[in-house]
Amino acid sequence: MRNAAPAHQAGFAALLCTIAFSAASGAATAAADELQALPQTRSIYVEAGYTDHRGPATRTRTVGLRVPLQYSWWQGRIRTHLDVYLSDWASTAAPPARRHNTQLGVVPMARYRFADGQSPWFVEGGIGLSYLTATHHTPNGPFGSRWNFSDHLGVGRNFGAQRQHEVSLQAKHVSNAGLRKPNPGETFVQIRYAHRF
């Protein structure tokens, strides 16, 4: 009978540990599920920036729509979306450079969240296509094509009770990858604000 008490105590301790582990796992799963559900809604964004070279600069203002895609990897830490945007490029280059040019773009993006997908911080990147409504001139010459690749890389953070606000720093390179000469390209640094709805 002396051994019965320690055996019961060990069994009771094991039961408590199992309950505690199950509760913690359930809470962690619920938190992860809640966070993973957040990016699956559309958002609109505005951003502004300028080219990274010295001399005559090109400033850009953009309005865009982010549409979630149903692809994710690494237990939801990497999620995908589609950026569809309209940009105004304002150039200070000398004639024959056009003062304003409009860019239409579509870029599939992949976003990685830190801390097993639960962090408000993220990095993202993607490569897509864009179209300029007129030939764009840079200090190094004109673009050889109106159709270009658009490479995006960003880092940012979500805010708010439902993480509905987002601020990020974006780097974007636009060029035709040498498919048509000349190909000076432009690289922009931009600040973005997005709101999820």
Task: Go through each PLM region and give its residues.
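Residues that define the transmembrane beta-barrel architecture of outer-membrane proteins
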Residues: 40-42, 57-63, 98-106, 145-151, ...
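Transmembrane beta-strands of outer-membrane beta-barrel pores
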Residues: 48-54, 84-90, 127-133, 171-177, ...
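Predominantly the C-terminal beta-signal and adjacent terminal strand-loop region
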Residues: 37-39, 153, 159-197
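Cleavable N-terminal export/targeting peptides
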Residues: 1-38
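Short loop/turn motifs that connect adjacent beta-strands in outer-membrane beta-barrel proteins
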Residues: 28-41, 69-79, 115-121, 161-164
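Transmembrane beta-strands of outer-membrane beta-barrel proteins
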Residues: 40-46, 76-84, 104, 121-127, ...
